[in-house]
């Protein structure tokens, strides 16, 4: 449903942000 779609999009966005942050902080890309 719509809620699971939104939840999935939010999760993907959060994971992407965390990956970028980790990349900058640790230098492991």
Swiss-Prot record:
Expressed by the skin glands. It holds the Pfam family Antimicrobial_2. It is found in: Secreted. Its main location: secreted. Antimicrobial peptide. It comes from the Eukaryota. Belongs to the frog skin active peptide (FSAP) family. Brevinin subfamily. GO terms for biological process: defense response to bacterium. InterPro entries: Antimicrobial_frog_2 (IPR012521). Disulfide bonds join 23-29. GO terms for cellular component: extracellular region. Keywords: Amphibian defense peptide, Antibiotic, Antimicrobial, Disulfide bond, Secreted. This is Brevinin-2Rb.
